[in-house]
């Protein structure tokens, strides 16, 4: 072997050794990065943002109580249907107790509790062009009335109070049935109808756009809101914690400030089950 060949082979060996060392360093760095990423990701999973499916009438108040969750607001009946179809979520807060109870019986949510209450009012456009002064004026021919569909809480409550008032006949003046209370409120505020039945709490949020007409207290049906952890929740601990925030003094204070009330016998803590 000539000196030139020997030097050439030596140079090749050095290059191979250097390349191997570089690959080893790169592999070690990759493992380090993977482990570091796993260490960062682990707490993120245990404190993942929960998803709360909540009645439209809770749109303004829930973020005041807890800003952390991802909220989806809609008609309670629509949200219950989503849960039945397997929508990924952690908490269900409805504008009645019927839907949470039905889902509990179906094994889709944990045992629900009542966390707040509301009452019904009649609203007209701010200018009140139909000159409606009481719920009994809705008997007049030609009145354009908005109500919720019979399957959503606001629609069910509306039909109950009308039955209590012996006014079920005014449903003949209904020009549209809506899927949630915010739709009723929005259309009345825009003057698309002469009147509509909504919750007091929703009416308070747009007092500059609607006129509120009180309904007889004796005819009011119990309007109670139920909440429960969804069985398919991937973060039950935070879901339970959220519900306990609703039941805690601060949560109840904020609900009261928004116009909600605390019914007798309300739970003070939630454990599910």
Specify the residue positions occupied by each region the protein language model found.
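Generic detector of short alpha-helix boundary/capping microenvironments
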Residues: 6, 15, 110, 214-215
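N-terminal secretory signal peptides that target proteins for export/translocation
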Residues: 1-13
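Generic low-complexity segments that are intrinsically disordered, proline-rich and/or Lys/Arg-biased
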Residues: 7, 24, 43-44
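Exported/periplasmic ABC-transporter solute-binding proteins
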Residues: 35-66, 70-72, 77, 81-85, ...
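Bacterial N-terminal signal peptides
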Residues: 19-36
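Alpha-helical transmembrane segments of integral membrane proteins
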Residues: 13-17, 51
């Amino acid at each position: 072997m000539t000196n030139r060949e020997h030097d050439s082979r030596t140079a090749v060996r050095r290059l191979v050794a250097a390349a191997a060392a570089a690959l080893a360093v790169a592999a070690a760095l990759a493992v380090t990065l993977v482990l570091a990423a796993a260490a960062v990701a682990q707490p993120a999973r245990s404190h993942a943002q929960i998803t709360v499916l909540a009645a439209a009438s809770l749109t303004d108040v829930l973020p005041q109580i807890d800003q952390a969750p991802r909220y989806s607001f809609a008609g309670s009946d629509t949200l219950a249907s989503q849960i039945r179809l397997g929508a990924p979520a952690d908490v269900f807060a409805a504008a009645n107790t019927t839907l949470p109870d039905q889902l509990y019986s179906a094994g889709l949510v944990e045992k629900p509790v009542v966390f707040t209450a509301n009452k019904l009012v009649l609203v007209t456009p701010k200018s009140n062009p139909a000159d409606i002064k009481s719920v009994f004026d809705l008997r007049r021919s030609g009145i354009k009335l908005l109500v919720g569909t019979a399957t959503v809480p606001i629609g069910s409550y509306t039909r109950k109070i009308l039955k209590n008032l012996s006014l079920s006949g005014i449903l003949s003046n209904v020009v549209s049935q809506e899927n949630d209370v915010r739709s009723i409120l929005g259309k009345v505020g825009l003057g698309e109808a002469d009147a509509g039945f909504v919750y007091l709490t929703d009416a308070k949020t747009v007092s500059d756009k609607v006129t509120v007409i009180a309904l007889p207290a004796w005819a009011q049906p119990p309007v109670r809101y139920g909440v429960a952890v969804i069985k398919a929740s991937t973060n039950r601990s935070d879901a339970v914690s959220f519900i306990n925030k609703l039941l805690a003094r601060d949560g109840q204070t904020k609900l009261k400030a928004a116009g909600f009330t605390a019914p007798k016998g309300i739970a003070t803590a939630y454990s599910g089950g």
